Structures are given as structure tokens and as C-alpha cells.
């Protein structure tokens, strides 16, 4: 269970760091477009502002997604021990650790690798409700649950 709590906390930190980085990037783009616009006129200026606005909208979308993931992660009780795979479970399958939480992908953590799965991920859906020792077949591959918390 300690692994799950540490992974959960580390994932929170990564999300917060990424939101902070994107916010700084957004501020810089906004500042740069304002500064480049001073004393400029014409089509070149308008195109520059439009491109900056598109980039800001893209960053805003990324920040919004990260905030949604942060909210979803807050709902998970990392202290809870599970006997079957469900939201908040951390499990080993085919010598790989997985955390049923948010779509984050592979997370390098304390000299090991944990793959963060969303609740829509095909592997999660195939294994949901199963216990240690049980298997599921996905894309022609057998997945056996070796450990679960």
C-alpha cells in the first residue's frame, strides 16, 4: 500500500508542476504578443496576435484537462486496500505495475515503472473486478494479475 500512496502523491505533484509550467508559458506568450504589438500595425501584427491567441487557447485546453485529472485523482482514496481491480487499485500484471486512476501513461518512479490507466483503458476494462491469480485476454495476450493493493 505504501507504493500506491507514494505513486498517488507523485502523480499529484507531476500534475501540479505541469499546470504551473503551462501557466508560465501562457503568460509569456501573452506578454510577448502584447510587446510585439506595440508600435506595429497591419496584417503582420494581426497574424501574430491571432497565432498567439491560438497558442493560448491550446494551452488553456491542456490546463483544463490537467485540472480535470487533478480533480479525478483527488477522489481516489490511496489508503484503501483492494481485493479486486477497481478505481484506485495498483496491481502487477505480466511483471508491470499499473495504477487505475487517470490517463497519464508511464510514470518512472523510485527505480521502477508504473503505468497509470484511465477507467476507459481497454486493459482496465478487461481486468476490472478480477482478483490476484485471475487472467484476462486482450488483443491476443493473456494478462495475469500477480499482485494487487
Label every PLM stretch briefly.
Residues 97, 141-145, 149:
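Short, charged beta-turn/beta-strand-edge "cap" motif at the junction between a beta-strand
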Residues 20-23, 30-36, 40, 89, ...:
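Generic serine detector
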Residues 79-138:
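Non-DNA-binding regulatory cores of transcription-related proteins
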Residues 1-76:
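N-terminal intrinsically disordered, low-complexity, charge/repeat-rich segments that act as generic
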Amino acid at each position: 500500500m505504501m507504493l500506491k500512496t507514494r505513486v498517488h502523491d507523485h502523480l499529484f505533484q507531476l500534475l501540479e508542476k505541469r499546470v504551473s509550467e503551462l501557466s508560465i508559458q501562457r503568460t509569456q506568450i501573452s506578454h510577448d504578443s502584447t510587446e510585439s504589438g506595440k508600435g506595429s500595425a497591419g496584417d503582420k501584427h494581426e497574424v501574430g496576435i491571432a497565432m498567439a491567441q491560438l497558442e493560448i487557447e491550446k494551452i488553456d485546453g491542456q490546463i483544463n484537462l490537467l485540472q480535470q485529472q487533478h480533480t479525478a485523482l483527488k477522489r481516489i482514496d490511496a489508503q484503501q486496500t483492494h481485493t479486486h481491480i477497481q478505481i484506485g487499485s495498483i496491481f502487477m500484471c505480466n511483471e508491470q505495475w499499473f495504477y487505475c486512476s487517470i490517463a497519464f501513461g508511464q510514470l518512472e518512479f523510485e527505480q521502477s515503472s508504473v503505468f497509470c490507466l484511465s477507467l476507459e483503458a481497454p486493459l482496465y476494462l478487461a481486468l476490472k473486478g478480477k482478483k490476484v491469480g485471475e487472467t484476462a485476454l486482450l488483443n491476443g495476450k493473456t494478462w495475469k494479475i500477480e499482485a494487487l493493493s
